[in-house]
């Protein structure tokens, strides 16, 4: 039986998400879900999350970003779904 479909998403998270432990939260949750990716602070105060792995796990992480049960708060989350690229090896905070 084949495993879950592997997907990738990029999420731009806007709100109070820098300096509050948000990237560490995303990295920890992503690793627990078996995902690889990055959580990167942007100059405008947003955080960009790139995650890749099984579709159900990616959907779970994307849902966590939107619900607001994260350090700080989110005003807006823009998620773009893509094909997996296979270029990530771990979940890192940048």
UniProtKB/Swiss-Prot annotation:
Domain of life: Bacteria
Residues of the Acylphosphatase-like domain: 8-94
Hydrolase found in the keyword field: yes
EC number: 3.6.1.7
Keywords recorded for this protein, A-Z: Hydrolase
InterPro entries with a match to the protein in the record: Acylphosphatase (IPR020456), Acylphosphatase-like_dom (IPR001792), Acylphosphatase-like_dom_sf (IPR036046), Acylphosphatase_CS (IPR017968)
Any coiled-coil regions, as ranges: none
One annotated GO molecular function: acylphosphatase activity
Residues the record marks as active site: 23, 41
Catalyzed reaction equations: an acyl phosphate + H2O = a carboxylate + phosphate + H(+)
Membership in a protein family: Belongs to the acylphosphatase family.
Record protein name field: Acylphosphatase
Organism of this sequence: Frankia alni (strain DSM 45986 / CECT 9034 / ACN14a)
Source taxonomy: Bacteria, Bacillati, Actinomycetota, Actinomycetes, Frankiales
């Amino acid at each position: 039986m084949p495993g879950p479909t592997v997907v990738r998403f990029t999420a731009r998270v806007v709100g109070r998400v820098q300096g509050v432990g948000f990237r560490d939260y995303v990295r920890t949750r992503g690793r627990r879900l078996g995902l690889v990716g990055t959580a990167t602070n942007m100059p405008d105060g947003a955080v960009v999350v790139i995650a890749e792995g099984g579709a159900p796990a990616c959907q779970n992480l994307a849902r966590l970003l939107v619900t607001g049960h994260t350090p700080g708060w989110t005003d807006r989350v823009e998620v773009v779904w893509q094909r997996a690229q296979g270029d990530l090896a771990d979940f890192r905070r940048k």
